[in-house]
Amino acid sequence: MAVPLGALWAWSVLDKAVISYYSRKYKPVPLPERPNYSHKDVSIIVPTIDTEDTFTECMRLWLKANPREIVIATVERNKARVEQLIEPLRQQHADKIMVVTAALANKRHQLIVGVKSARGKIFALVDDDVYWHVDSVVPYLLAPFEDAEVGAVAGIQSAEVPPERQDVRVITPWEATATFDLCQWKGSREVHFAADGGCWCLSARTLFIRASILQDQSFANAYTQEVIGRRLVNTADDVVLTGLVFDRGWKVSIQNTPEAEVTTNIPRDHRLVWQVLRWDRGNFRTFLGYMLVSPGYRKMMQRHPYTTWKMVERLARPIWAFAYVWAWLQTLYTAPWIAYAYIAWMAFGWKGWLPTYREFLKRYPYCGRQMWAPLLMDYIGPIVDIYVYLTINNDDWLTRRADTKDIED
């Protein structure tokens, strides 16, 4: 009964070989000698509610990039909070900062309200807890737009870990898990893009998009009028936006290079669980919609075959996990040395646990004590997926106080 485990083992090796090949194949777009776009063409749009104290520092870094303007889209109950946080920057940058309010605390609706006030050729959609520490973010995210077929671009996202928390005695398991997850995610995106030009999600932490796309009323309607039952959807804003960009015939680009790296605040406690649940519910709903409704599995495979297959794999993770566990237990009973060899290979072999975690700890050595947490998260992931399927229609934001609204008759 070692045959099933052997087959799954061989499939795993093949999968890693394919990933390795496309990872080497990936190349970011270099800076053009004579760019058609500059910082003066960029309008930053920031939807925000329950705005954190770090917003002032994030704003300072965005303003340092010298964009055309920053449009902050909030709601009336949060406007005073935003005004308080940007006050230290008002005197020097009054002509570049605009605060607008939406009627609904819904990220998609707030974004479109911001779009209506922005004047740039390129919109930078930015989360309110994102830092642009490097001065090259804007030029490197603008570079792919030299190709007239590219509609949207995203770069690398990493964890923002303040100096006082870069300590093995201070950092929490939640922070270590979030940091590791971001590292793994950016690697998978470049592989998907190199394979077939596809991408699950251009993260809205920092996403550059042509203004004309979001200013199209049909696009805005499709983006803001998605419903679950009768309730307007709030979550999965960037996943849905990415799909709509593809649906309208645009290409995207991934700039996985240090020059395009931004960092983001990460949860220090159990709020990471709520964040993961929100992301996974939104992703699963969207992926299932792609496969079963529009554009449909066949068209998805024609458009982005590798990315679509990886999407199917992600949706089927509980089934894959059960298959591996069943095959390993059967092999343990009939040929234990093969079962133990498989575990050893998983731990120490090519791209196994130990090499992967060692590479991560080179950059984040202070996470060393907490590496049990990312490992645990990886292996309870299939169980979490089952819970996500059972609660897939739950669209609560969970970590912030978003509004809910039912569509009218």
Curated annotation (Swiss-Prot):
Record keywords: Glycoprotein, Glycosyltransferase, Membrane, Transferase, Transmembrane, Transmembrane helix
Class of this enzyme: transferase
Membrane topology: Single-pass membrane protein
Catalytic activity, EC: 2.4.1.-
GO cellular component term of the entry, any: membrane
Residues the record marks as carrying a glycan: N36
Pfam family, one: Glyco_tranf_2_3
Pathway connected to this protein: Secondary metabolite biosynthesis
UniProt GO molecular function: glycosyltransferase activity
Task performed by this protein: NDP-glycosyltransferase; part of the gene cluster that mediates the biosynthesis of luteodienoside A, a glycosylated polyketide consisting of an unusual 1-O-beta-D-glucopyranosyl-myo-inositol (glucinol) ester of 3-hydroxy-2,2,4-trimethylocta-4,6-dienoic acid. LtbB likely serves as a glucinol synthase by transferring D-glucose to myo-inositol using NDP-glucose as a substrate. The ltbA carnitine O-acyltransferase (cAT) domain uses glucinol produced by the glycosyltransferase ltbB as an offloading substrate to release luteodienoside A from the HR-PKS.
Name listed for the protein in its UniProt record: NDP-glycosyltransferase ltbB
